[in-house]
Amino acid sequence: MYALLEAIEARARANRARVAMGIRDPNHKTLESAWKAQELGYAQVVLVGSKKEIDKIGTGLEVIDTEDPEKVLSDLLVSRKVDAVIRGTAKASGTLSSLKKALGMKRICRLALLLTADGTPFFLAPVGIDEGNTISDKLRMITLGAEHIRRLGVEPAVGVLSGGRMGDIGRDRRVDRTLADGEFITGRALELGINTKHYTILIEDAVKESNFIIAPDGISGNLIFRTVAFLGGGDGLGAPVLMDDYVFVDTSRVGGHFTKAIMLASALSHLNKERKKVIH
């Protein structure tokens, strides 16, 4: 897995995709991280937001002037005027609803890529607060996520989490339900040929032994993401939406660092181009 980041960086530099980034309430830190991605050769970065506000801070990057970056990001992606999009600091609800509308999708699945404080990378799902609330949702995330992870040259090892240890059965009905769900999901994923283990509540063991963590639901997944990236000294590279024809990497507005998310988007765009060559 440690070689994963090197592979992503190499693909980004080989591709140097045109990547659009949503901007609201711009600040120096945000714009500097976008400029750094272009300077390092990861992508040609296009900022999408209020030019007036962006120019107050200053940037050497291309700017598409709009007061509605949430909608324009999806328009740029669907029209293929850019190779990939990252949400940047655009609003989450508006951006994702515009994306679903533009692509005719009822639901989306996101797969976050995180680094622990010691630099260990792992994938995480679900990460949206309204995602992964049913067994079928989580199984869909496992199958889609495993497929996308393999495209990066990594064999997925799935670690399923639940709300307690097996010895806790009987203490709480909700905990019992998550444990039963964890056992069922693990068994079904194994039947589908995906290397999967139920780690109960022991996330520390799951991260050591697995590279794709499945949280009990989207709320706990979002909390794991925020704890690792914003409190635990780790980092979040972004959360790509799992789809074949387009590249959209969701990001959090909190951190302010978008260099690696742009790198990831450019690399995924490169993988998409390679896959389409093979198909055709």
UniProtKB/Swiss-Prot annotation:
Keywords: Methyltransferase, Transferase. It is an enzyme of class 2 (transferase). One of its GO terms (biological process) is methylation. GO terms for molecular function: methyltransferase activity. Its EC number is 2.1.1.-. InterPro entries: MeTrfase_MtxX_xsu. May be part of a complex composed of 3 subunits; MtxA, MtxH and MtxX. Belongs to the MtxX family. This is Putative methyltransferase mtx subunit X. It comes from Methanosarcina mazei (strain ATCC BAA-159 / DSM 3647 / Goe1 / Go1 / JCM 11833 / OCM 88). The lineage of its organism: Archaea, Methanobacteriati, Methanobacteriota, Stenosarchaea group, Methanomicrobia.
